[in-house]
Amino acid sequence: MEKLTILLLVAAVLLSIQALNQEKHQRAKINLLSKRKPPAERWWRWGGCMAWFGLCSKDSECCSNSCDVTRCELMPFPPDW
């Protein structure tokens, strides 16, 4: 009975060590991914105009020539929308 108890304790310790290692690995992966910029922030200026979802204050600043208050739109919406 003592051997079974010791075996169960060793198994519990090994499982908890494995769980801790997996948790650390997941945290490291999350930290790596959180350092990357989201796709909208990866766009850059092309030829003096701001690409999609870039910051803007007027239509002429956007490559699509469509500024929606603070961000460039992918394309202008038809006027009848």
UniProtKB/Swiss-Prot annotation:
Expressed by the venom duct. It is found in: Secreted. Residues 1-19 form the signal peptide. Its main location: secreted. GO terms for molecular function: ion channel inhibitor activity; toxin activity. Belongs to the conotoxin O2 superfamily. Gamma-conotoxins may act on voltage-gated non-specific cation pacemaker channels (HCN). This is Gamma-conotoxin-like TxMEKL-0511. It comes from Conus textile (Cloth-of-gold cone).
